[in-house]
Amino acid sequence: MRNLLPLFLSALMFTGCAASQKQENTYRRISMEEAVQMMENESGYVILDVRRPDEYAAGHIPGAINVANETIGAAEILELPNKDQLILVYCRSGRRSKEAAEKLVKLGYTNIVEFGGILDWKGEIEA
Protein backbone atom coordinates (compact mmCIF):
# COMPACT_ATOMS: atom_id res chain seq x y z
CA MET A 1 0.00 0.00 0.00
CA ARG A 2 2.86 2.38 0.85
CA ASN A 3 4.36 1.82 -2.59
CA LEU A 4 1.12 2.80 -4.31
CA LEU A 5 0.84 6.25 -2.70
CA PRO A 6 3.89 7.81 -4.45
CA LEU A 7 2.78 6.24 -7.72
CA PHE A 8 -0.72 7.65 -7.31
CA LEU A 9 0.59 11.14 -6.42
CA SER A 10 2.93 11.13 -9.43
CA ALA A 11 0.11 10.14 -11.76
CA LEU A 12 -2.12 12.85 -10.31
CA MET A 13 0.60 15.47 -10.74
CA PHE A 14 1.23 14.54 -14.39
CA THR A 15 -2.49 14.55 -15.13
CA GLY A 16 -2.82 18.04 -13.67
CA CYS A 17 0.11 19.32 -15.73
CA ALA A 18 -1.27 17.87 -18.94
CA ALA A 19 -4.69 19.39 -18.33
CA SER A 20 -3.27 22.86 -17.72
CA GLN A 21 -1.23 22.74 -20.94
CA LYS A 22 -4.27 21.76 -22.97
CA GLN A 23 -6.08 25.05 -22.29
CA GLU A 24 -8.29 25.87 -25.25
CA ASN A 25 -7.96 29.15 -27.10
CA THR A 26 -11.19 31.08 -26.79
CA TYR A 27 -12.55 34.60 -27.11
CA ARG A 28 -13.77 36.93 -24.40
CA ARG A 29 -17.24 38.47 -24.29
CA ILE A 30 -17.39 41.96 -22.78
CA SER A 31 -20.03 44.65 -22.39
CA MET A 32 -20.29 47.69 -24.62
CA GLU A 33 -19.06 49.85 -21.72
CA GLU A 34 -15.99 47.64 -21.27
CA ALA A 35 -15.31 47.87 -25.02
CA VAL A 36 -15.43 51.68 -24.90
CA GLN A 37 -13.07 51.66 -21.93
CA MET A 38 -10.71 49.30 -23.78
CA MET A 39 -10.75 51.57 -26.85
CA GLU A 40 -9.86 54.55 -24.66
CA ASN A 41 -7.07 52.81 -22.73
CA GLU A 42 -5.50 50.30 -25.13
CA SER A 43 -3.50 50.83 -28.30
CA GLY A 44 -2.69 48.65 -31.27
CA TYR A 45 -6.15 47.10 -31.47
CA VAL A 46 -8.43 46.57 -34.46
CA ILE A 47 -12.18 47.18 -34.39
CA LEU A 48 -13.78 44.57 -36.64
CA ASP A 49 -17.30 45.09 -38.01
CA VAL A 50 -18.57 41.73 -39.29
CA ARG A 51 -21.81 42.99 -40.87
CA ARG A 52 -22.46 43.01 -44.61
CA PRO A 53 -20.70 45.77 -46.60
CA ASP A 54 -23.99 47.64 -47.16
CA GLU A 55 -24.66 47.70 -43.40
CA TYR A 56 -21.11 48.90 -42.75
CA ALA A 57 -21.49 51.67 -45.36
CA ALA A 58 -24.71 52.87 -43.71
CA GLY A 59 -22.82 53.55 -40.46
CA HIS A 60 -20.04 52.02 -38.37
CA ILE A 61 -17.86 52.70 -35.35
CA PRO A 62 -15.09 55.14 -36.36
CA GLY A 63 -11.91 53.32 -37.36
CA ALA A 64 -13.61 49.94 -37.77
CA ILE A 65 -12.67 47.71 -40.67
CA ASN A 66 -15.25 45.53 -42.39
CA VAL A 67 -14.89 41.80 -42.94
CA ALA A 68 -18.31 40.22 -43.37
CA ASN A 69 -18.98 37.24 -41.09
CA GLU A 70 -19.99 35.16 -44.11
CA THR A 71 -16.49 35.51 -45.60
CA ILE A 72 -14.50 34.57 -42.48
CA GLY A 73 -12.91 31.18 -43.01
CA ALA A 74 -13.28 31.21 -46.80
CA ALA A 75 -9.79 32.62 -47.34
CA GLU A 76 -6.93 34.25 -45.46
CA ILE A 77 -8.03 37.55 -43.91
CA LEU A 78 -5.59 40.05 -45.41
CA GLU A 79 -6.96 42.86 -43.24
CA LEU A 80 -5.95 40.90 -40.10
CA PRO A 81 -2.39 39.65 -40.66
CA ASN A 82 -1.36 39.60 -36.97
CA LYS A 83 -3.08 36.69 -35.23
CA ASP A 84 -1.95 37.94 -31.79
CA GLN A 85 -3.33 41.47 -32.18
CA LEU A 86 -6.24 42.58 -30.00
CA ILE A 87 -9.36 42.40 -32.19
CA LEU A 88 -12.64 43.91 -30.94
CA VAL A 89 -15.53 42.31 -32.84
CA TYR A 90 -19.08 43.63 -33.27
CA CYS A 91 -22.05 43.31 -35.64
CA ARG A 92 -25.61 44.65 -35.52
CA SER A 93 -27.10 42.78 -32.57
CA GLY A 94 -24.41 40.37 -31.32
CA ARG A 95 -25.27 37.12 -33.09
CA ARG A 96 -22.87 37.43 -36.04
CA SER A 97 -20.08 38.84 -33.87
CA LYS A 98 -20.29 35.74 -31.67
CA GLU A 99 -20.11 33.48 -34.74
CA ALA A 100 -17.23 35.51 -36.17
CA ALA A 101 -15.31 35.40 -32.88
CA GLU A 102 -15.65 31.61 -32.79
CA LYS A 103 -14.43 31.34 -36.39
CA LEU A 104 -11.47 33.64 -35.74
CA VAL A 105 -10.39 31.53 -32.78
CA LYS A 106 -10.55 28.39 -34.96
CA LEU A 107 -8.36 30.19 -37.51
CA GLY A 108 -5.71 30.74 -34.83
CA TYR A 109 -6.39 34.30 -33.68
CA THR A 110 -5.47 34.52 -30.01
CA ASN A 111 -6.75 37.87 -28.71
CA ILE A 112 -10.41 38.14 -29.74
CA VAL A 113 -12.87 40.23 -27.75
CA GLU A 114 -16.55 40.25 -28.77
CA PHE A 115 -18.74 43.10 -27.57
CA GLY A 116 -22.13 42.63 -29.20
CA GLY A 117 -23.89 44.91 -31.63
CA ILE A 118 -23.92 48.46 -32.89
CA LEU A 119 -27.56 48.75 -31.80
CA ASP A 120 -26.21 49.25 -28.26
CA TRP A 121 -23.43 51.65 -29.31
CA LYS A 122 -23.84 55.08 -27.71
CA GLY A 123 -20.78 56.67 -29.31
CA GLU A 124 -20.11 58.31 -32.64
CA ILE A 125 -21.14 56.62 -35.89
CA GLU A 126 -19.20 57.16 -39.10
CA ALA A 127 -20.71 56.70 -42.56
Regions found by a protein language model. Give the residues of each.
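Rhodanese-like catalytic fold shared by cysteine-dependent sulfurtransferases
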Residues: 2-6, 17-38, 45, 54-86, ...
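Hydrophobic beta-strand scaffold positions of dinucleotide-using enzymes
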Residues: 47-49
